[in-house]
Amino acid sequence: MADPNPQSAIRDPQSATDLAVLHAIASLASSAADAASAQRQILSIIMAAFPADSGSLALLSPETGGLEIGVQQGLPSDVGEFALKPGQGITGWVALHGQPLLVPDVAHEPRYISARAGVRCEMAAPLSADGHTLGVVNLDADRLGAFTDADLARLTRYAAEAGTVLHRLWQYERLRAHSQQLTTLVELGHALVTQLAPEELLSTLTQSGRALFNARLCLLHDYDGERRELRL
């Protein structure tokens, strides 16, 4: 959203930075190759705006309901296996309540769960779209009180914009997948109508089936009723 008073951004360097970060995130809706690429770029953009030593972008899994780290910077390589339930840890609390949280000193926070030694300060904000929490952006610092309330407010704005961008990219990817499936069905119907030779028809069926479900392999078996067995 454009600033009604552009001169105010010039007088306030922090406001100008805020607008630049929001614009960089918003532009990913049209420039990112896919949602996975956008996640990596979003985290890099956000981390560069704060004195953060590590950070992560975690998403709520529709299959397990858990909070799974999609991308991270500065954390141990095996942190991808580190999954939290909603309400568990600081990021889990943010995911469950859909509210940002700042912890100036993690040593005095009973909800804190360590993913990296040396972290002293942490803040997290929800990724959301259409009123639903999609995940959490989490930043860590090795200095006590490294993040302020103003930083948390900024992170909340960035995370909200990031959630909108990712939601749009996921919608586009679903539409593209549906379009590809429709194209495959049309091609399959055309093959049946043109009455291909049996060998060609079977080959078309397997190729179309593989493309339709984006599968690595598709096999078509012939059932022998007398022997009660399948033949490849």
Ranges and model annotations:
Residues 120-129:
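A short, aliphatic-rich beta-strand micro-motif
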Residues 77-101, 123:
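Acidic/proline- and glycine-rich, intrinsically disordered low-complexity segments
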Residues 75, 136-145:
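Short beta-strand-to-loop transition segments that serve as allosteric relay/switch motifs
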Residues 133:
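Glycine-rich acetyl-CoA-binding "A-motif" of GNAT/NAT acetyltransferases
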Residues 156-164:
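Allosteric cytosolic regulatory segments
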Residues 19-37, 41, 45, 183-200, ...:
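Short regulatory/linker helices and ligand/cofactor-binding micro-motifs at input modules
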Residues 43-47, 54-82, 207-210, 217-232:
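GAF sensory/regulatory domain recognition
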Residues 150, 166-183:
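Short alpha-helical interdomain "coupling" segment at the junction between an upstream regulatory sensor module
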